[in-house]
């Protein structure tokens, strides 16, 4: 099943931030969001709320059409990851991934994001750790200057 605009937990015009309520019927759904320059994928639902609130502020309203955010739990299978890369991430300039745990926590997704970035060096991949113990190892695989 392909989801483009399903019942989101968090709603902003045209679902720029997407968080699908966690029920079993959604576990294999394919996710698509409109293209944007900036993509934020996170393990933390509260991050989505913060971004949503930020985009509601008048001085950041212009960013609404250029940022997408998604909870990582919506990208569990290889098919979901591949589809999201093809339909949404391929059009981005910057992807920020915030993950709890090490690279193995979302290994296939990280591998595909690294391939996405390697294909075009102008693209930027920022990987943030949700825990201090993985901060260095995840930052090292980001494509931004570490200094």
PLM regions and their residue ranges:
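An N-terminal assembly and electron-transfer interface module characteristic of large anaerobic redox
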Residues: 2-147
């Amino acid at each position: 099943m392909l989801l483009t605009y399903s019942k989101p937990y968090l709603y902003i015009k045209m679902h720029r931030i997407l968080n699908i309520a966690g029920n079993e019927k959604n576990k294999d759904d394919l996710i698509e969001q409109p293209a944007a320059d900036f993509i934020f994928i996170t393990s933390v639902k509260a991050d989505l709320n913060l971004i949503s609130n930020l985009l509601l502020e008048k001085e950041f309203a212009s960013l609404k059409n250029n940022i997408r955010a998604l909870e990582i739990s919506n990208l569990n299978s290889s098919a979901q990851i591949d589809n999201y890369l093809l339909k949404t991430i391929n059009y981005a300039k910057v992807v920020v991934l915030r993950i709890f745990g090490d690279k193995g926590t979302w290994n296939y997704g990280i591998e595909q994001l690294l391939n996405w970035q390697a294909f075009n060096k102008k693209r930027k991949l920022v990987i943030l750790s949700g825990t201090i113990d993985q901060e260095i190892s995840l930052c090292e695989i980001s494509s931004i200057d570490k200094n």
